Curated annotation (Swiss-Prot):
GO terms for cellular component: cytoplasm. HAMAP family: ProA (MF_00412). This is Gamma-glutamyl phosphate reductase. InterPro entries: Ald_DH/histidinol_DH (IPR016161), Ald_DH_C (IPR016163), Ald_DH_N (IPR016162), Aldehyde_DH_dom (IPR015590), G-glutamylP_reductase_CS (IPR020593), Glu-5-SA_DH (IPR012134), GPR_dom (IPR000965). Keywords: Amino-acid biosynthesis, Cytoplasm, NADP, Oxidoreductase, Proline biosynthesis. It comes from Streptococcus pneumoniae (strain ATCC 700669 / Spain 23F-1).
Amino acid sequence: MVSRQEQFEQVQAVKKSINTASEEVKNQALLAMADHLVAATEEILAANALDMAAAKGKISDVMLDRLYLDADRIEAMARGIREVVALPDPIGEVLETSQLENGLVITKKRVAMGVIGIIYESRPNVTSDAAALTLKSGNAVVLRSGKDAYQTTHAIVTALKKGLETTTIHPNVIQLVEDTSRESSYAMMKAKGYLDLLIPRGGAGLINAVVENAIVPVIETGTGIVHVYVDKDADEDKALSIINNAKTSRPSVCNAMEVLLVHENKAASILPRLDQMLVADRKEAGLEPIQFRLDSKASQFVSGQAAQAQDFDTEFLDYILAVKVVSSLEEAVAHIESHSTHHSDAIVTENAEAAAYFTDQVDSAAVYVNASTRFTDGGQFGLGCEMGISTQKLHARGPMGLKELTSYKYVVAGDGQIRE
């Protein structure tokens, strides 16, 4: 096993091969990575079967689905890499140019961060997405996968590095930490001088640990306590469609709805319909029904478990939905501000003034009017695959694509000027 220190030194030694690579060279490397990923399908699936067998009974079915790979999912991962090829190279982009009175020409241009560390849980597609985005944005990457997905991740990284071996980019620009203990995560948090940026992707425990302990710069990809508010002026059919999509299409992802707020004028009509759609209809279709966590007012209209205070602060990542009835738009916004993780929140309304109030007052990375929160995604936003959803305001916010993985520098050109 290569030590963490050796890996940090290896990636530092080769980072220039990617930091200054041309767009053509990077695109050739990405295509080679995608091709080798597909070529290694058999090996990746064998590794994934080991991870799935070890995880069965230890994590929920929803989380098992995150971990699971088949040939179609591997092809989708390769397609995601190829889509990054089509994106414009951000490196070298001139952001601003100005000329001073003394003749100095100052150019602000986009540059790579250097080496980016990613700590993430059991999602194999993060491995290929992170490798593709960091490479196209001119960065080397150190990956630290969750233990549940390690065999799969190792097989994926092996394939990606074999792809790089056919190019002029050194394969060591992609590093996988072999130690999946907590100590390896903490070592990355303290790797000042080796990592220029650290991005955690996972649950609240992981993200909080990184934010609280890291001495290297961190972008917080926050958990998603995502709200949908059904206003008194909502179109109910539209609301039901949005709720269904936001909750059931993929409940294990961070942009899935966890809390439903319903105006009291709509509760009696929409909640029974919601119960029919999310419970009875799903049972009849052989699908897992939604389990409700209901406040006292909501429980008058549908059956479910009484909500506890913590239910409105929980990212369930499962077929569970907390429901609260509110008396006004202002109460809905106040609730969101008290409980939101500032990821994605939505209002369903036909009232333009209510929509404007909601979008002005709700301080989240993505705020929706009459649309599902499931659109908070780099691919859906036209950014290609994403590194995560930032819930902070510095240095990036919302879905992080290529530009969010870069910095800038000033190039100052003169003709012998000196400062008086």
